[in-house]
Amino acid sequence: MSTQTLRVGIGGPVGSGKTALVARLCQELRERFNIAVVTNDIYTEEDAQFLIRHQALTEDRIIGVETGGCPHTAIREDASMNLAAIDTLTARHPGLDLVLVESGGDNLSATFSPELSDLTLYVIDVSAGDKIPRKGGPGITKSDLLIINKTDLAPIVGASLEVMDRDARKMRGDKPFIFSNMKTGEGLQDIIRFIIDQGMLQAA
């Protein structure tokens, strides 16, 4: 068991597949690690309810934060609601190894406060077009791991994975990125390996 709780921030635009990724990560990791989730929604707890319905974790391990107004503020300038939620989860479940913090749907300029996130994953999806990686922004260029999700939609929307691969390399330099598809599980084990290795997680 880790001595300190690893906080992983998961950001990305609305509809990119953040909640589906969180659900899959929980299902894969819950037997090996003591984990919990904080979700951010503007006016509802819809993402938290999705995770509960899909039995990602037990309900007492999931807290939905209603950010109101601008969701970026809750993960950056004023992370107090999220930090309070993490404190609540830590009190409920002593010895937490991992907390996944899912941001509300954001734009390419949103970033996590360093006090809220030790590792940041940024999720974009192929259906938004193959130009997204080269648009840049902190999510694309500075996140610890960029996840290019919904690869199965590439032929439908006419997006080139080769172009996205090239542009992601150009924009990110040496920083890693992974192509994924949560329906088939493509890329999931690579994402898990990244979290465990970079977060130095040790199974109990």
From Swiss-Prot:
Disulfide bonds: none annotated. GO terms for cellular component: cytoplasm. Facilitates the functional incorporation of the urease nickel metallocenter. This process requires GTP hydrolysis, probably effectuated by UreG. This is Urease accessory protein UreG. The keyword Nucleotide-binding applies. GTP binds at residues 12-19. It is found in: Cytoplasm. Belongs to the SIMIBI class G3E GTPase family. UreG subfamily. InterPro entries: CobW/HypB/UreG_nucleotide-bd (IPR003495), P-loop_NTPase (IPR027417), UreG (IPR004400). CDD domains: UreG. Pfam families: cobW (PF02492). It comes from the Bacteria. GO terms for molecular function: GTP binding; GTPase activity; nickel cation binding. Homodimer. UreD, UreF and UreG form a complex that acts as a GTP-hydrolysis-dependent molecular chaperone, activating the urease apoprotein by helping to assemble the nickel containing metallocenter of UreC. The UreE protein probably delivers the nickel. One of its GO terms (biological process) is urea catabolic process. Keywords: Chaperone, Cytoplasm, GTP-binding, Nickel insertion, Nucleotide-binding. SUPFAM superfamilies: P-loop containing nucleoside triphosphate hydrolases.
